[in-house]
Amino acid sequence: MGSSSGQKPRRLEDLVDKLASGSLSHSRLEKELGNANEAALVRRLYLERLTGASLSSVASTILDFQELYGRNIENPIGAVQVPVGVAGPLRINGDYARGDFYIPLATTEGALVASVNRGAKAITLSGGARAKVIKDGMTRAPLLWTPSVYEAHRLAMWVEDRIEDLRSVVAGVTRHGRLQHIYPYIIGNLVWLRLSFSTGDAMGMNMVTISSDRICRYIEENYDGDAKCIALSGNMCTDKKPAAINKILGRGKYVVAEAVIKGEVVKNVLKTTPQNINLVNVTKNLLGSAAAGSHSFNAHFANIIAAIFIATGQDAAQVVESSMGYTWTEVRGEDLYISVTLPSLEVGTVGGGTRLPTQRELLALLGVAGGGNPPGSNALKLAEIIASAVLAGELNLLSAIAAGQLARAHELLGRGGLKIS
C-alpha cells in the first residue's frame, strides 16, 4: 500500500517532466492518466514550475473534470470564481414567468446588484413587469457557391420549394429541433441560407450547426445544378458579433419587458421625475447612440445580461448580440412607461454550461433548471426573467443619471466606500 501511494506522486512528476521536455502534449494527458482530475493537477504542477506562479486558488473547485472533459472544457487546470449576489424580489407577469423572483448576478462590478435591486423594487411596487417573447428561433447561415447569379437565384428558389424535405432532414438529426424558415440572401454568385430553428429548452447552437451541415449535404447531393457549401457559417447568422440582421429578424428569443412606474414611486424610490428619466433616455440612449453609430440603444443591457449569463451557465460570448436592443420611455400623466426590447437574447436551460453544479443551482433558484413541461417553456421563462431584470437595471441607471446620483453610487459601492462595520 505504501509503495503504490509513493509511486503515484512519482508518476505525476514524471509526466510534468515529459510536458517540460515536449515529449508529451497537454492534449494527451487525460488519455495517459485515464483521469481528467489528475490531468488537471499535472498541468498545474507544470505551469507552477514553468512560471513560478501559485495556482492553489485555481485548484480549489467543486468541479469534477471527469464529468466535464470532452463536453465543456479541454486541457483543464481548475476553475475561477465570481461573486454572486441577488437582486429582488422582482415581480414578473409574463406568459411563462409569473411571480416574484430573486435574480442571481455574477459580477465583480460594485453597484450593479444594488442598481438592479432598486429598479426591481420600483417595478414591484408599481405592480410588476410584463414580459413577452415575440419570436423564438436560433439561426445558422451556411454560405454556398454557384457559378453565376442565375444559378444562385435558381438554387435559392429550389431550396425554398423543398423546405418540407429539409425539415425531414432535420428531424432525422434531432427530436428537439425543427426547421422553421429559410431566408436566402444573394450577393453576386453566392447564396447565404439563413436557417431558423426551434430548439426547445436548449440555446441550440450545437443542434442548429449539425442540422445545417446535414442540410448542406442534402443540397450538394440532390440539387441538379452546380452548388457547393464553402462555409457552414457564413456570418449572416450572426453569432457572437453585433449585426443589424439580428435586430431586424431576431435570433434566439425576441423578447420585450415593460412596466408603468407610478409617479410616487419615481419620486420616493428613484428620487427623480418621469420627465427627467424620459429626457435622459431620449437624449442618451436614442440620440447619443445614433450619433455614435451604436447597434445598442440602451444604457447597460450588457451589464445585467453578462452577470446572469455567467450565473446561469449561458454562453458568455453571446452577450455581444444578446445585449443589443432598445430602451423606450413615455411620460403618461404622473407615471412613467418604460420598456426594453431584446431582439436576439440567446439562452437555454439544458446543455452547455447549464450542466455545471453552481449554475444549475441558480437556474433552480429561478425555477428553470433542466427541460420544461411543455418542452421549451423553461427557456422562454428564463428569457422573460432576464428581460425583466434588464428592465430593472435600465430603469435604475436612467433614474440615477437623471437625479445626478451615478458618480456617488460608484464612489460608495464601486470603490470600497461601503463598510460592514
Swiss-Prot record:
One GO BP annotation of this record: isoprenoid biosynthetic process
GO MF annotation, one: hydroxymethylglutaryl-CoA reductase (NADPH) activity
Enzyme class: oxidoreductase
Pathway info: Metabolic intermediate biosynthesis; (R)-mevalonate biosynthesis; (R)-mevalonate from acetyl-CoA: step 3/3
EC nos: 1.1.1.34
Coiled coil: none
Keywords of this entry: Isoprene biosynthesis, NADP, Oxidoreductase
Domain of life of the native organism: Archaea
Substrates-to-products reaction catalysed: (R)-mevalonate + 2 NADP(+) + CoA = (3S)-3-hydroxy-3-methylglutaryl-CoA + 2 NADPH + 2 H(+)
Matching InterPro entries: HMG_CoA_Rdtase, HMG_CoA_Rdtase_cat_sf, HMG_CoA_Rdtase_CS, HMG_CoA_Rdtase_eu_arc, HMG_CoA_Rdtase_N, HMG_CoA_Rdtase_NAD(P)-bd_sf, HMG_CoA_Rdtase_sub-bd_dom_sf
Catalytic center residues: 109, 240, 315, 410
Family classification: Belongs to the HMG-CoA reductase family.
Function: Converts HMG-CoA to mevalonate.
Record's protein name: 3-hydroxy-3-methylglutaryl-coenzyme A reductase
Organism whose genome encodes this protein: Aeropyrum pernix (strain ATCC 700893 / DSM 11879 / JCM 9820 / NBRC 100138 / K1)
